[in-house]
Amino acid sequence: MDKKVIIIIVITLFFVLKKIRKIIGPLLLVLVFLFLFNNIKNIKSFFQTPKNEESTYSFLTLKNSDINTKENLKNKKIGYIESFMPVEIDEYVLKSYDANNIYNVLLKKEVDAIYISDSYLSVLKEEYKDILEQTKIVEEEKVENVILATESKNRDIINIFISGTDSKKEKITSKSRSDVNIILTVNTKKNKVLITSIPRDYYVELFSNKKDKLTHCGVYGITVCTETLNKLLDIEINYFLKINMNAFTKVIDLLNGITLKDGTKLTSEEALKYVRERYSYKEGDRKRVENNQDILEEIIKSFIRNKSLLLNYKDILESLNGYYMTNIDENLIVEVIKNLLLGKSLKIERQILNGFDSYDTTYSIPNKKLYVMLPDDKSLETAREKLKNMLP
């Protein structure tokens, strides 16, 4: 049967024969599964997207060093950031350092070179404006980091970490700052969704009890982000979805724009400005986080209202290729699509973690006090309680 014919039949059943849904229920179920079965290859295309992060690691030496090739590094002393040595390098003398010392030990010539990722080099550029003039890259290596999904202890509850990068140029597989941080908690049994947003500047505990902004977690990888949020919220994140600005604007274009609760219609570029702007608001990033939730909720509702979007998901996924990465299980996607096609209602709730404005040093940029948001214990406890209430 032609795909378009199936789409017409299913939409007709939904919108013309609503009053006799009980009678056609079994037939509708068959048609839904027919559609999913006939298009299972299209679903699988979603899961052929990147699931692993890639990093470029560089051997960095001082500009006036006589080390110019990787061969020159043999038997030399190499510094690396503690807990972040992605490969075994036997031919070098290795020594680990905290992130706050890694560049200083090179400047003081305590090591001959340092081994760091491109994502952390971008952070160092903020603190040391002349780092590229003072150093040179001897060798670069591509390293792939596997990101495993965590099986839920309760199959009815799924926690998905959504990470949004503030870039259109970076490869989606590159480690980068996480400017949008959302936990999407889905109760598949009750058809409930809880959107939990955490501000980018939230002052959180990373590995080894080090404090940093949440946005900097992304520099060290998605796994560090999820582990940090698991600890903060006392939850278990099962999957991740990482998107960039291209993915965002393309989804809005596919929806022919987005309409806010107050009736304001936004184009994709206007919506992008709406979710990025924070300096013009008195509430700053708090307002930006709220705007992010507005758009995400409307996107979810748009898919629920317009079943044809679900039926044409192949085109949607193909148009987003290269702009997102995920390790979401295909069975979960099939379950969600099936429930929405069968007309099951979805209750959406939302919450935003709050805190207090402050300035403090961070693990990533230790020699300079940056703006951070100190967690409000009451807000944190309320958020944890809401997440627990999502359990069956």
Show the residue positions of the predicted features.
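Membrane-embedded alpha-helical segments of integral membrane proteins
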Residues: 1-18
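Hydrophobic membrane-insertion alpha-helices, especially the h-region
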Residues: 24-37
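Hydrophobic alpha-helical transmembrane segments in integral membrane proteins
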Residues: 36-49
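Non-catalytic, solvent-exposed segments at the cell envelope interface
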Residues: 47-52, 60-64, 70, 74-392
